[in-house]
Amino acid sequence: MARIKVHELREKSKSDLQNQLKELKAELALLRVAKVTGGAPNKLSKIKVVRKSIAQVLTVSSQKQKSALREAYKNKKLLPLDLRPKKTRAIRRRLTKHQASLKTEREKKKEMYFPIRKYAIKV
């Protein structure tokens, strides 16, 4: 089997990807048997290509699944953890801009009764 082009995989449906994955895994099993029984050298070198193809199929299928989930949760209030942006732990726990801008009643009164003085310089 020749190397698979990823752009061709992206056009396939989910069921086609699953079928291709089964075929590739079956082929890999045959190649491993050939390796143990002392098969031809060209079969041994084919193992790497098949393993890479399996990885490509799995990657494309997981990317499709994740993009479908992103579409499903697009306008929802809460997102699953794996769809949220990956930030540092400290940034995730930081106050939101709204929370940081809130002021206590006492602070509001102090600002209202004692505003910052503005001075104009006479020329």
Swiss-Prot record:
Please state which protein family the record places this protein in: Belongs to the universal ribosomal protein uL29 family.
Is Metal-binding set as a keyword in this record?
no
So which domain of life are we looking at?
Eukaryota
Q: Which keywords does this chain's UniProt record carry?
A: Ribonucleoprotein, Ribosomal protein
A Pfam family hit: Ribosomal_L29
Q: Name one GO cellular component term.
A: plasmodesma
Q: What is the lineage of its organism?
A: Eukaryota, Viridiplantae, Streptophyta, Embryophyta, Tracheophyta
What gene, per UniProt, encodes this protein? RPL35A
An annotated GO BP? translation
Q: What is this protein called?
A: Large ribosomal subunit protein uL29z
The record ties this protein, via InterPro entries, to: Ribosomal_uL29, Ribosomal_uL29_CS, Ribosomal_uL29_euk, Ribosomal_uL29_sf
Task: From the UniProt annotation, give the residues forming the signal peptide.
Answer: none
Single annotated GO MF: mRNA binding
